[in-house]
């Protein structure tokens, strides 16, 4: 790979959501990602929902938003919100106000968590940070971030496992495979897709899910 000079640009992408079981893989629904860039700021959204035919088996909707600034070529997160429903019950519903310069995060404006540094990243914007850092440091093998979620702020390592060719819809894509074992997360980023994920594998408890890219539209 010859990596270009890093630049963040607006894009939208659709992924197919699969559940992997002992009986095989089931296509449950879709997940949409959208990055909006304007005036040295970004808004990164994701939305997921299951198909009507699978609602009886796994009725799930989720919406995430990550908002931040770009200053001196650095991504500075300010705000994160998630709303997730399983059936009629809210399984996740909280917001995080991030104060990097003061090195703390406010959870639902009720609890303040202190961070060890100003490098605070939420569960959605971490993909933007990985895209940026891999391009700027192509020989580095481990990237560490302070990931904040409802459990607090924890340092997590993302290991660059090397190049991997994967097949999506009969198209071979050259990717970089990244593993975050503490998050039980593995994903592949692609140069052709601005170093954003084309495949994401996530394990939650005993459930194993994957997101596989269906389409990607970049705006310049």
Model region roles, listed by residue range:
Residues 85-127:
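Hydrophobic, well-structured mid-protein blocks that either form specific transmembrane helices
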Residues 41, 110-148:
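Short, structured interface segments that constitute the first stable element of a domain
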Residues 103-107, 133-134, 176-180:
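Alpha-helix C-terminal capping segments
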Residues 3-97, 138-220:
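Acidic, serine/threonine-rich low-complexity disordered tracts
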């Amino acid at each position: 790979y010859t990596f270009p000079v890093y630049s963040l640009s607006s894009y939208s992408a659709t992924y197919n959501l699969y559940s992997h079981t002992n009986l095989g893989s089931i296509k449950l629904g879709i997940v949409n990602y959208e990055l909006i860039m304007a005036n040295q700021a970004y808004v990164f959204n994701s939305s997921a929902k299951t198909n009507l035919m699978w609602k009886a088996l796994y009725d799930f909707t989720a919406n995430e938003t990550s908002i931040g600034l770009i200053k001196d070529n650095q991504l500075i997160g300010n705000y994160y919100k998630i709303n997730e429903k399983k059936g009629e019950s809210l399984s996740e519903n909280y917001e995080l106000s991030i104060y990097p310069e003061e090195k703390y995060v406010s959870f639902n404006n009720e609890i303040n968590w202190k961070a060890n540094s100003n490098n605070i990243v939420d569960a959605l914007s971490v993909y933007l940070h990985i895209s940026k850092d891999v391009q700027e440091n192509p020989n580095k093998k481990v990237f560490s971030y302070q990931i904040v979620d409802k459990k607090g702020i924890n340092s997590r390592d993302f290991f660059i496992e090397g190049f991997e060719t994967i097949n999506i819809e009969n198209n071979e894509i050259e990717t970089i495979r990244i593993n975050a074992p503490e998050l039980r997360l593995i994903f592949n980023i692609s140069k052709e897709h601005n170093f954003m994920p084309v495949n994401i594998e996530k394990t939650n408890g005993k459930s194993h899910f994957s997101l596989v890219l269906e389409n990607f539209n970049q705006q310049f």
